[in-house]
């Protein structure tokens, strides 16, 4: 199987690439800078400046993970990376692939109040970041349908594991005593371990789950405060204090803080019907992750 991955050097993308290679897939990565995996082909380029070409070959599937960080404050950059980059990618690949899997986030569901979010829930993004991600999704859906290209979308919960924001921002700052909870921390979040995200993305292809959407999160929504406190327990450090939401927005950006502090509880019944999660709950995943970091 030939696979193209965008965002291949990111937290999720790099793990996905490693798994695909181990499964025997022929993987090509679209990157802006070097990649350490010598077992893959690379195409160097920036989707916001598509002055490059892909090899003259077809891909069984394209995983589109490339996106800006939700904390990006410049709206022009948000649009250039998340929407324009997606349009440019499709233009380059529309005759080279049979299936596109778009990787998005739960932010597109906006504020569901007390409702449990699943694949049939209303899509009502309330941040600029999520609105642009949804716009890109709709572009792909429409154009894939027109050209007969299979399309599916994975809405990821907050991804944790040994790397990415979880390690480099949350864990490191908790260890230094410099992390503060935005607001009360009593808002619910739906987390998912990076290994289970990779398994879910694999399963969408293995089960040929075309033209569908999947909520990818574990089965135990938890308040951000309780999630952080469990990390502190495993690290053996003091639980953090909090800062007013308005101050957090000034530091981390309004969109990012709005996404983080909006309560969202999800059902993962659909994705777990085709994929077995290793860490069915953060209660299992956090101790395993912190143990891995210490080893």
Language-model features: where?
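Glycine/proline-rich active-site loop of Rossmann-fold NAD(P)-dependent oxidoreductases
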Residues: 134, 147-149, 159-169, 203-214, ...
């Amino acid at each position: 199987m030939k696979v193209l991955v965008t965002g291949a050097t990111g937290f999720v993308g790099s793990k996905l690439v490693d798994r695909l290679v181990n499964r025997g897939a022929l993987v090509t990565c679209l990157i802006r800078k070097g990649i350490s995996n010598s077992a893959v082909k690379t195409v160097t380029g920036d989707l916001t400046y598509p002055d490059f070409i892909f090899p003259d070959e077809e891909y069984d599937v394209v995983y589109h993970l490339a996106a800006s960080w939700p904390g990006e404050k410049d709206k022009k950059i948000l649009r250039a990376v998340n929407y324009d980059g997606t349009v440019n990618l499709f233009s380059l690949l529309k005759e080279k692939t049979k299936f596109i899997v778009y990787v998005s986030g739960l932010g597109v569901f906006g504020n569901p109040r007390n409702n449990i979010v699943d694949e049939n829930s209303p899509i009502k993004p309330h941040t600029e970041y999520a609105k642009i991600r949804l716009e890109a999704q709709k572009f792909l859906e429409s154009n894939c349908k027109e050209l007969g290209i299979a399309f599916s979308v994975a809405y990821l919960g907050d991804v944790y594991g040994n790397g990415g924001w979880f390690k480099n921002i949350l864990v490191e700052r908790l260890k230094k005593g410099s992390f503060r909870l935005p607001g009360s921390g009593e808002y619910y979040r739906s987390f998912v371990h990076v290994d289970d995200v990779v398994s879910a993305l694999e399963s969408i292809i293995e089960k040929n789950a075309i033209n569908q959407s999947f909520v990818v999160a574990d089965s135990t929504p938890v308040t951000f405060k309780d999630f952080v406190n469990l990390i502190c327990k495993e690290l053996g450090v003091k639980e953090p204090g909090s800062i007013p939401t308005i101050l957090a927005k000034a530091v981390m950006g309004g969109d990012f803080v709005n996404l983080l502090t909006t309560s969202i509880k999800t059902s993962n019944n659909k994705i777990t019907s085709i994929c077995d999660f290793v860490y069915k709950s953060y209660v299992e995943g956090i101790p395993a992750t912190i143990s891995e970091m210490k080893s």
